[in-house]
């Protein structure tokens, strides 16, 4: 099982310099980006990477771009968030249809341990499992803060008797 998790973990850890920061350094966004990148420059970078902006929307006063086509194992979608045309958050959404709950748990545990090695003990921000009608919803989240920047690691699952949806996301944020 862990052999299949390690390629995902390696890809996640290579996603950007945020995992290589030490001490109280600012957490940097993935893909060698910088906080405050302009939306114009991001559009050019995404075009150069042959990625597609599949949707643009407004989320809580921020412009959000749903992007597909960034090459990374298991990465289904990346969401870039802008305020005033400047990058303030990057959300990496990982999904693999052939993974069960145990594989997601193992992957999340490995990522959490790596983050703790870099940034110390994370803060548990959510751990709940509760029904919503005939759907059982699970939400587990951890957060690490450094110098007005943060990483959140979130697992979400919704399971009914006939369907299941699972996703793991890593949110890089600046405040």
What are these regions (language model features)?
Residues 1-9:
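Bacterial N-terminal signal peptides that target proteins for export
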Residues 8-17:
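Bacterial N-terminal signal peptides
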Residues 4, 14, 26-27:
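Compositionally biased, intrinsically disordered/low-complexity regions enriched for serine, proline
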Residues 23-61, 94-175:
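Non-cytosolic coordination micro-motifs
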Residues 65-109:
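Mid-chain, structured segments of secreted extracytoplasmic proteins
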Residues 6, 76, 86-88, 138, ...:
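Residues at beta-strand starts and edge strands
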């Amino acid at each position: 099982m862990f052999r299949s998790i390690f390629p995902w973990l390696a890809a996640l850890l290579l996603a950007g310099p945020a995992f290589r920061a030490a001490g109280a350094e600012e957490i940097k966004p993935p893909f060698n980006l910088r906080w405050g990148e302009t939306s114009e420059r991001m559009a050019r970078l995404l075009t150069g990477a042959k990625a597609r902006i599949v949707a643009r929307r407004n989320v809580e006063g921020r412009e959000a771009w749903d992007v597909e086509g960034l090459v990374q194992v298991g990465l289904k979608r990346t969401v870039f968030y802008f305020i005033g045309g400047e990058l303030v958050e990057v959300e990496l959404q990982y999904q693999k249809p052939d993974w069960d709950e145990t594989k997601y748990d193992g992957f999340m545990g490995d990522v959490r341990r790596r983050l703790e090695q870099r940034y110390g003990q994370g803060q548990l921000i959510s751990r709940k499992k509760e029904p919503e009608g005939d759907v059982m919803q699970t939400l587990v989240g951890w957060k690490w803060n450094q110098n007005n920047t943060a990483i959140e690691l979130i697992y979400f699952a919704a399971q009914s008797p006939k369907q299941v949806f699972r996703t793991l996301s890593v949110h890089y944020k600046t405040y």
